[in-house]
């Protein structure tokens, strides 16, 4: 993740009047980096990396970004003054000794199998999507760890300062003691069979919300003190084989009128489903008529080893057992047509496999909600690829549906907070399913299995519909102007306008951004606060993009809609 402005791509060391003096001062660094550059493997952008390294050292920058350069290694001597190092989306298999001053390390999306000793000053560690089997000793000041999507089998002792720990999709079988400082924990998709005692804070702000996400494990036991947590705490235990006794006990205790403990979410079933998956090609061909199955099978055999293929196969089998599959006319044909599109687009297939990987085998309505999301993925992909380039009205309709679904998700999220005992999937699906006709939601299934236990009332639905229509009237055009598929259309069909808008944005970055961020921090009394600076920077950037993209959106829509008689605003 980037936390600084893009570098000046026109920077040239040869143009720097005091380069010779500087290069003498840092001769050892420059010599080592030049030697490292000459050892580049094919495809590595080490020349750009060295330019960035020298610029950082000469200017004594505190931040160094070497993202997306296809680097297989880093030089042994990094600039010693840096506090922030970003090296994401490379091909790194190891890291050199890290600067003693380092506070922020983002090394996600690499091939790291080990980490070096971490500096004592480190506060933020992001190593998502690597090949780590263990973490080194953790610094005492560390506040944030993201080690999702690795191969961790155990964790070291956690520092007492730790506030965020995310280790989703690993192979953990147990957790160490959790520190009292912890505010967010995500250990979803591991092999945990139990949880340690949850830290109970004696003193913390009532505004601090604490989240423990432990879904998709093998948890059969929960700590005895779990109900002693504050109402500001949320614990997600869905898709774990909790015994019926524990589920009944949780249900009874959290339903008491005087209950003031945490919000606890767990699945209605015990999760003891058969986890054997049949071959992907077999699961796919089952959706097609017999005269097509042989050809379809040959095509899909080629995708058997793609990431998430097994879970996608299981998802298709569970989808065939949903209420919609059993009762909705034309549903099988709809799924078959969608599968044909997936077979011809590797990008769409990859996206869809990833979405389906989040579906559980133990909850029918989660499968139904995932099907909704997959249909959204298809439509957004088609829009981004140009399907609606010549049909602005259809693109607006699609955007309007995506906007309505976003608002419903916000409403569902707020509703979930009011319920102690609930499978949140039922709440999200209830709003989409029950309002599908009134809000013209083409991607939503028309039936769900557990609406009766969703906690969503008729009054909730009426209020939600009114809120969606009100926010659509006031916010849709601003939202649409920032929508990715619309930007893709503008780049292809309005190249000159798009280029002008981008030029405006970068002029603002160069001439106004820093001052506007500084003014905002000064007004709020937060000058020098790094977190506040990042937040203020994001706000300024969004406001700028909103203004610039809204202007070009208004111009293009006014022209196109006047030509075909369409309207931007309708119910």
From Swiss-Prot:
It catalyses: S-ubiquitinyl-[E2 ubiquitin-conjugating enzyme]-L-cysteine + [acceptor protein]-L-lysine = [E2 ubiquitin-conjugating enzyme]-L-cysteine + N(6)-ubiquitinyl-[acceptor protein]-L-lysine. Keywords: Host cytoplasm, Leucine-rich repeat, Repeat, Secreted, Transferase, Ubl conjugation, Ubl conjugation pathway, Virulence. The keyword Coiled coil does not apply. The keyword Ubl conjugation applies. It is an enzyme of class 2 (transferase). Its EC number is 2.3.2.27. GO terms for biological process: modulation of process of another organism; protein ubiquitination. Its main location: secreted. The active site is at 363 (glycyl thioester intermediate). LRR repeats lie at residues 58-81, 83-99, 100-119, 120-144, 146-159, 160-184, 186-202, 205-229, 232-260. Residues 279-571 form the NEL domain. It is found in: Secreted; Host cytoplasm. NCBIfam families: IpaH_Shig. The LRR (leucine-rich repeat) domain forms a slightly curved solenoid and may mediate interaction with target proteins. Belongs to the LRR-containing bacterial E3 ligase family. This is E3 ubiquitin-protein ligase ipaH3. It comes from Shigella flexneri.
């Amino acid at each position: 993740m980037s936390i600084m402005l893009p570098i000046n791509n026109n920077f040239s060391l040869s143009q720097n009047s005091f380069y010779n003096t500087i290069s003498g001062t840092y001769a050892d660094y420059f010599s080592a980096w030049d030697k490292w550059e000459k050892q580049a493997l094919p495809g590595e952008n080490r020349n750009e990396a060295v330019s960035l390294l020298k610029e950082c050292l000469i200017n004594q920058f505190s931040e160094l970004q070497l993202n997306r350069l296809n680097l297989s290694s880093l030089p042994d001597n990094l600039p010693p003054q840096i506090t922030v190092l970003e090296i994401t989306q490379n091909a790194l298999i190891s890291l050199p000794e890290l600067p003693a001053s380092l506070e922020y390390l983002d090394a996600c999306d690499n091939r790291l199998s080990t980490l070096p000793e971490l500096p004592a000053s480190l506060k933020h560690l992001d190593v998502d999507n690597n090949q780590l089997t263990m973490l080194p000793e953790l610094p005492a000041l560390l506040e944030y760890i993201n080690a999702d999507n690795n191969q961790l089998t155990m964790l070291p002792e956690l520092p007492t300062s730790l506030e965020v720990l995310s280790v989703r999709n690993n192979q953990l079988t147990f957790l160490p003691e959790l520190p009292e400082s912890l505010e967010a924990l995500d250990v979803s998709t591991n092999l945990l069979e139990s949880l340690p005692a949850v830290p109970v804070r004696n003193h913390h702000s009532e505004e601090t919300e604490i989240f423990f996400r432990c879904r998709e494990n093998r948890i059969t036991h929960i700590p005895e003190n779990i109900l002693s947590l504050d109402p500001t705490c949320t614990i997600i235990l869905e898709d774990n084989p909790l015994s019926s006794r524990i589920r009944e006990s949780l249900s009874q205790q959290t339903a008491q009128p005087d209950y003031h403990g945490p919000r606890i979410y767990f699945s209605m079933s015990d999760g003891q489903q058969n986890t054997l998956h049949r071959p992907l090609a077999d699961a796919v061909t089952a959706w097609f008529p017999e005269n097509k199955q042989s050809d379809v099978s040959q095509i899909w055999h080629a995708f058997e080893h793609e990431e998430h293929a097994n879970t996608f196969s299981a998802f298709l089998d569970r989808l065939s057992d949903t209420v919609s599959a059993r009762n909705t006319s034309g549903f099988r044909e709809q799924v078959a047509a969608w599968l044909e599109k997936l077979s011809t687009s590797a990008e769409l297939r990859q996206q869809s496999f990833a979405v389906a990987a989040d579906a559980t085998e133990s909850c029918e309505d989660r499968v139904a909600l995932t099907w909704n999301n997959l249909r959204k993925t298809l439509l957004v992909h088609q829009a981004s690829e140009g399907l609606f380039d010549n049909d602005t009205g259809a693109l607006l309709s699609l955007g309007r549906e995506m906007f309505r679904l976003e608002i419903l998700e916000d409403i569902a999220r707020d509703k979930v907070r009011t319920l102690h005992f609930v499978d949140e999937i039922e709440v999200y699906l209830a709003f989409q399913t029950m309002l599908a006709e009134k809000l013209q939601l083409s991607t939503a299934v028309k039936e769900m299995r557990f609406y009766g236990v969703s906690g969503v009332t008729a009054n909730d639905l009426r209020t939600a519909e009114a809120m969606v229509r009100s926010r659509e009237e006031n916010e849709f055009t601003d939202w649409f102007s920032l929508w990715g598929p619309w930007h893709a259309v503008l780049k292809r069909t309005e190249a000159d306008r798009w280029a002008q808008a981008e030029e405006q944005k970068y002029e603002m970055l160069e001439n106004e951004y820093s001052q506007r961020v500084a003014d905002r921090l000064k007004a709020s009394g937060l000058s020098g606060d790094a977190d506040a600076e990042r937040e203020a920077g994001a706000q300024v950037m969004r406001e700028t993009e909103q203004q610039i993209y809204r202007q070009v959106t208004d111009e293009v829509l006014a022209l196109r809609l006047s030509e075909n008689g369409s309207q931007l605003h309708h119910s």
